[in-house]
From Swiss-Prot:
<dbReference type="InterPro" id="IPR036754">
    <property type="entry name" value="YbaK/aa-tRNA-synt-asso_dom_sf"/>
</dbReference>
<keyword id="KW-0436">Ligase</keyword>
<dbReference type="InterPro" id="IPR004154">
    <property type="entry name" value="Anticodon-bd"/>
</dbReference>
<dbReference type="Pfam" id="PF04073">
    <property type="entry name" value="tRNA_edit"/>
</dbReference>
<dbReference type="InterPro" id="IPR033730">
    <property type="entry name" value="ProRS_core_prok"/>
</dbReference>
<keyword id="KW-0030">Aminoacyl-tRNA synthetase</keyword>
<dbReference type="GO" id="GO:0005524">
    <property type="term" value="F:ATP binding"/>
</dbReference>
<dbReference type="InterPro" id="IPR002316">
    <property type="entry name" value="Pro-tRNA-ligase_IIa"/>
</dbReference>
<dbReference type="InterPro" id="IPR023717">
    <property type="entry name" value="Pro-tRNA-Synthase_IIa_type1"/>
</dbReference>
<dbReference type="InterPro" id="IPR004500">
    <property type="entry name" value="Pro-tRNA-synth_IIa_bac-type"/>
</dbReference>
<keyword id="KW-0067">ATP-binding</keyword>
<dbReference type="InterPro" id="IPR001387">
    <property type="entry name" value="Cro/C1-type_HTH"/>
</dbReference>
<keyword id="KW-0648">Protein biosynthesis</keyword>
<dbReference type="InterPro" id="IPR045864">
    <property type="entry name" value="aa-tRNA-synth_II/BPL/LPL"/>
</dbReference>
<comment type="similarity">
    <text>Belongs to the class-II aminoacyl-tRNA synthetase family. ProS type 1 subfamily.</text>
</comment>
<dbReference type="InterPro" id="IPR007214">
    <property type="entry name" value="YbaK/aa-tRNA-synth-assoc-dom"/>
</dbReference>
<protein>
    <recommendedName>
        <fullName>Proline--tRNA ligase</fullName>
        <ecNumber>6.1.1.15</ecNumber>
    </recommendedName>
</protein>
Length: 600
């Protein structure tokens, strides 16, 4: 392709809307252009990158025996109501674009396709002889992000590969899951990315287990915790660890003590001259289920630890059937205005006790009359602890479970693991922290959707059984931008060869020099004929502008028909290292060919 004929405009200044390096560079280098909030046009250079990523994804998926298809973007609400996710996606998380057609039928623009694929399986799969089967698509998805940001990282429209597998039993699912794990690792390696596969929370998709694939980058939105021995890695939302040991309590006798102005753990520990590890803090949450029921939740956790609200939400979802609900649509620490809806009397905030009475709740049809009481594992064995006295300005000291306070029945792990904690699998290992960009997520769904939607098959004994499912997503457009976030310098993008829009760029410093033009044209033709995808910068621009643009755009190899031409050589510059060497004209094609082959 000739740059003189391409829609190609670069920017010298960083756009105001861009926050992270990859977003700035893709805009400046003319790869994307913003159309609206979270909506971007993929311009010719970007489209080539996306096609290359898609092709690698396609090859690795096909190698596992998966079959490509294309599913509808418009999805009837009835399917989502069958699975129980319509309210979750339109009200709770609120990420689905919902609309009505002219017959007032509800539809959603697909953020994911579990319901559609389960409907297809229900209609078409009858026998175990048809299994296993794995279907995938590469398609535009839509999500109504609250705060679209970072360009293609968190947009409202994006390109994704999603796959859905059907097996006869959990063992078959595990094999498919392992195949997908291997395929995803191959995809990321072939794209030239440094990554970690980590344990993850399944979120609204559900299922028994899941794993995320994180591209490591300082601007990553996710925190990854891992051990140096390579045996553990998890998203912080899912991570488990051993907390620091608690210090011995200095309070041997039970007493109530005045503790003015100690409504935080830090103030309390300073006032009592004790460690936060001997304090039981009691945190009040307000949970709203998908049927509108409000439930008040009291969590007891050690004073030096924080509640992981993803873990907490998962525990509360397990309790949903008790309230004739399916999921949580909101979870928050209630402020004073929220408390007015249900508080029968003023709460002693900052001084709440583990036995806060249910009489604080003014129950109704929409408000559960009793607290859900959850105790974190960090305080179950705590002795002679400090905690609130249910009276402003007072705490109790030297308290114990089974004596002064009844230990709640629901013992859970809702603490946030953090860097420096000891690993569960090996106490000598400590958790390290890194930032990551989630580009892939694989799930073992089990029978969640097939049970809900009646998707079954007949086994060898003639019994009707639910299909065992898995789902596997990888963000094509997000992966492409992640590559930039992982590899750039002060001058621009440094594309991995495998997904660069072009392998090489031939730059003519002076288009008024017939020899430079002639050699460049011949080389351009020969490189493309040799399978090296090549750009020709034949624009009527200053040489300095052309060199700056080539570095900004990030093409792996730059060939210049400049000064060394008089000696029968061309200057070849490697973008990643900026290493420059003069190579005889007749050796340039074979040299670039070898470099590209080695990099792929």
């Amino acid at each position: 392709m000739r740059l003189s004929q391409m829609l190609f405009v670069t920017l010298r200044e960083d756009p105001a809307e861009a926050e992270i390096p990859s977003h700035k560079l893709l805009l400046r280098a003319g790869y994307i252009r913003r159309i609206g909030s979270g909506i971007y046009a993929y311009l010719p250079l970007m489209w080539r990158v996306l096609q290359k990523v898609s092709q690698i994804v396609r090859q690795e998926m096909n190698a596992t025996g998966a079959q490509e298809c294309l599913l509808p973007q418009l999805q009837p609400s009835e399917l989502w109501k069958e699975s129980g996710r319509w309210d979750t996606y339109t009200k709770a998380e609120g990420i689905m674009f919902a609309l009505e057609d002219r017959q007032e039928r509800e539809l959603g623009l697909g953020p994911t396709h579990e319901e559609v694929i389960t409907f297809i399986a229900r209609e078409m799969i009858r026998s175990y002889r048809q299994l296993p089967v794995n279907l995938y698509q590469i398609q535009t998805k839509f999500r109504d992000e609250i705060r679209p940001r970072f360009g293609l990282m968190r947009g409202r429209e994006f390109i994704m590969k999603d796959a859905y597998s059907f097996d006869t039993d959990p063992e078959g699912l595990k094999k498919t899951y392992q195949d997908m794990d291997k395929a995803y690792r191959n995809i990321l390696r072939r794209c030239g990315l440094a990554f970690r596969a980590v344990d993850a929370d399944s979120g609204a998709i559900g299922g028994s287990g899941s794993q995320e694939f994180m591209v490591l980058a300082d601007a990553g939105e996710d925190e990854v915790l891992y051990t140096d021995d390579g045996k553990y890695a998890a998203n912080v939302e899912k991570a488990v660890s051993l907390p620091p040991d608690e210090e011995p309590s200095p309070f041997k006798n039970y007493e109530k003590r005045e503790t003015p102005n100690t409504d935080t753990i830090e103030k309390l520990a300073q006032f009592l001259k004790c460690s936060p590890t001997v304090v039981v803090k009691n945190i009040l949450y307000e949970a709203v289920y998908d049927n509108g029921m409000i439930v008040l939740v009291l969590v007891n956790i050690r004073g030096d630890q924080e509640v992981n609200e993803v873990k907490l939400q998962n525990e509360l979802v397990k309790l949903a059937p008790q309230y004739h609900a399916k999921t949580i649509i909101a979870l928050k620490v209630p402020d004073e205005s929220a408390q007015q809806k249900w508080a029968a009397k003023s709460l002693p905030l900052g001084y709440i006790s583990p036995d806060l009475g249910d009489d604080y709740i003014q129950g109704s049809k929409e408000i559960a009359s009793k607290f859900v009481r959850l105790v974190d594992k960090t305080v179950v064995e705590l002795k002679n602890f400090v905690t609130g006295a249910n009276e402003k300005g007072y705490h109790v000291l030297g308290a114990n479970w089974g004596k002064e306070f009844k230990l709640p029945q629901l013992i859970v792990d809702v603490r946030t693991a953090k860097a420096g904690d000891r690993a569960v699998h090996d106490r000598t290992q400590t958790l390290q922290s890194a930032r990551g960009i989630e580009v892939g997520h694989i799930f073992q769904l089990g029978t969640k959707y097939s049970h809900a939607m009646g998707a079954t098959y007949t086994n060898e004994q003639g019994e009707e059984m639910p299909l065992v499912m898995g789902c596997y997503g990888i963000g094509v457009s997000r992966l492409a931008q992640s590559a930039v976030e992982q590899s750039y310098d002060k001058d621009g993008i440094i594309w991995p060869v495998a997904i660069a829009p072009y392998h090489a760029i031939v730059v003519i410093p002076n288009i008024n020099d017939p020899q430079q033009v002639e050699v460049a044209e011949k080389l351009y033709t020969e490189l493309n004929a040799a399978g090296i995808e090549t750009l020709l910068d034949d624009r009527d621009e200053r040489a300095g502008v052309k060199f700056k643009d080539s570095e900004l755009v990030g093409i792996p190899y730059r060939i210049v028909t400049g000064r060394s031409l008089k000696e029968g050589k061309l200057e070849v510059v490697e973008r990643a290292t900026k290493k420059s060497q003069d190579i005889p004209i007749d050796e340039v094609v074979s040299t670039i060919q070898q470099w590209v082959k080695a990099a792929l």
